[in-house]
Amino acid sequence: MVITTTLCALALTLPLGEEEYYEIATIPIPDEIVLEVSAIEILEDGTALVATRRGDVFSVTGIWEDDVSSAQFNLYAQGLQEPLGLLSHEGWVYVMQRGELSRMRDTRGDGRMDELETICDLIPISGNYHEYSFGPAIGPDGNFWVTTNKPFGGEPFGRADWRGFTMSINDAGEMHPTCSGLRSPAGVESSPWGDVFYTDNQGEWCGASKLSIMKPGDFHGHPHGIASCKKEEWTYSVVENVPDGKLFPEVKLEIPELRLPAVWFPYDKMGRSPAGMAWDMTEGKFGPFAGQLFVTDQYDASVMRVALEQVNGNWQGACFPFRMGLQCGAI
């Protein structure tokens, strides 16, 4: 009796696991579809547009039902080049391809894209496999902000300008470099108040993955590509001679343009490759995290939670593990 009572008491006091509060519902994928999800955008009617690394976009319905096994996949677009971002905006779906910001829409109402326009194809690429492009997000200037990955390894067609940058693109397709020093900026998102934040992956010149706000003229720490800042398109101060082997706060004293991160993600304890993010705007419907930020991680197949605050004009915050156990990396 004593043993039974003790065990019952322990069962009542042990905290429940995260899976008891936030379930993961796996949507079955038709056998004929190779998904390799690279971007997701939820439309006003609840339909999910799902892009794939291979260049397809599917519209997925039925994902909000209690039983997601009835979800339907329909091909919306195909033939894109590595689309890594979708944004529904003013009747169009904007898509970030490897070297081009495009927009597309379905004008016939049959669920298939029938109109595709190039907004800007000025983003240089050298042919390196790692020259990904992410976004777009609407910036405080009303333009589309996109981020460009630096290359890793050979550059078959020579060094390309504006790699490791944030680019602001207006409706006319004009592109203006806005921030430098990015490494592998896999997530870019507009905040509810209009600023744009991005996530960067750990590696050389970036000791741990991070979350940072982006402001025009910022330098984010990686020296690759800063030679592009000597071109006339760069209208801010030029950063040169980035010191090696010093902590970020020390470098900030030497390079005032350096943007200190709002949050560092502890290596391995909080993944290694943060990517896409979303603010909780449900006003409590998703739990006690209203206004906080959720960040996915590609390496760790997880979702992290971030609480931010602004102190004396600077953003800082804390990060927490939120949900493990995804079946693949999330981007």
Task: Give the location of each predicted region.
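Sec-dependent N-terminal signal peptides
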Residues: V2-T13
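Beta-propeller domains with acidic blade repeats across secreted/periplasmic ectodomains
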Residues: L12-I331
